[in-house]
C-alpha cells in the first residue's frame, strides 16, 4: 500500500506541473482519455490501460460535481496504480471498496487533489462552520472531506471528523446535494 506521504508527494508534483487541481485539466495534460458512457446504476467509473493509452470511463448518468470526484479518484488509480492496471487489465472488483488498499489510496488521492489545505484551514477557522457546511462550500461529499481530515491528521494537524466515511460511499448513489450549483 502506498504511504500517505507518497500519495501527497504525487499530488503536489502533479498540481505544480499542471498548475491546476482540476482532474479533467490534469488528465488532458497527461494524455489520459476521458469517456462518458451509460454504465447503468452499478458502476460509477473505472480506469484502464490499453494499447499504451490510459483511459477513464465515467458514468454519463453522474452529475458534473460527482464526475469531478470520480475523475479525481480514477486519476489516482492512473498515477498510483498504473503499472498494476497495465499488468492485469480491468477486472471487475468491488470498486471503491475500502478493504482493497488501492481504493483507499485512490480516495486519499482524490481528497488531496480536490481540497487544498489552505482552503480547508480557512473554512475551519471561520466561526459557525459545520463539517457539512464546509463540505458543501468545497463542493464535495462529506465522505471526501473525512478523507481530507485523515490526511491533515497525518500531516500533524489534529482535526477530528464528526463523520466517518462508509467503506462503499462511492459505490452508492451520490446525490448532488453537497452543492447543487455544480450540476
Which positions does each model-derived feature cover?
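Active-site hotspot residues in diverse enzymes, especially metal/ion-binding acidic/histidine motifs
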Residues: 1-183
Amino acid at each position: 500500500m502506498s504511504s500517505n506521504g507518497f500519495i501527497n508527494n504525487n499530488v503536489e508534483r502533479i498540481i505544480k506541473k499542471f498548475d491546476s487541481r482540476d482532474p479533467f485539466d490534469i488528465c488532458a495534460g497527461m494524455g489520459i482519455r476521458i469517456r462518458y458512457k451509460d454504465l447503468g446504476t452499478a458502476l460509477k467509473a473505472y480506469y484502464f490501460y490499453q494499447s499504451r493509452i490510459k483511459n477513464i470511463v465515467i458514468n454519463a448518468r453522474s452529475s458534473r460535481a460527482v464526475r469531478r470526484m470520480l475523475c479525481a479518484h480514477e486519476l489516482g488509480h492512473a498515477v498510483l496504480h498504473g503499472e498494476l492496471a497495465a499488468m492485469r487489465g480491468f477486472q471487475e472488483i468491488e470498486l471503491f471498496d475500502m478493504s482493497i488498499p488501492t481504493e483507499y489510496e485512490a480516495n486519499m488521492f482524490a481528497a488531496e487533489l480536490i481540497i487544498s489545505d489552505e482552503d480547508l484551514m480557512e473554512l475551519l477557522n471561520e466561526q459557525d462552520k459545520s463539517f457539512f457546511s464546509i463540505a458543501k462550500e468545497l463542493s464535495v461529499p462529506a465522505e471526501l472531506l473525512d478523507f481530507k481530515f485523515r490526511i491533515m491528521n497525518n500531516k500533524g494537524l489534529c482535526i477530528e471528523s464528526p463523520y466517518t466515511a462508509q467503506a462503499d460511499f462511492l459505490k452508492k448513489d451520490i446525490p448532488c446535494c453537497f452543492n447543487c450549483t455544480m450540476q
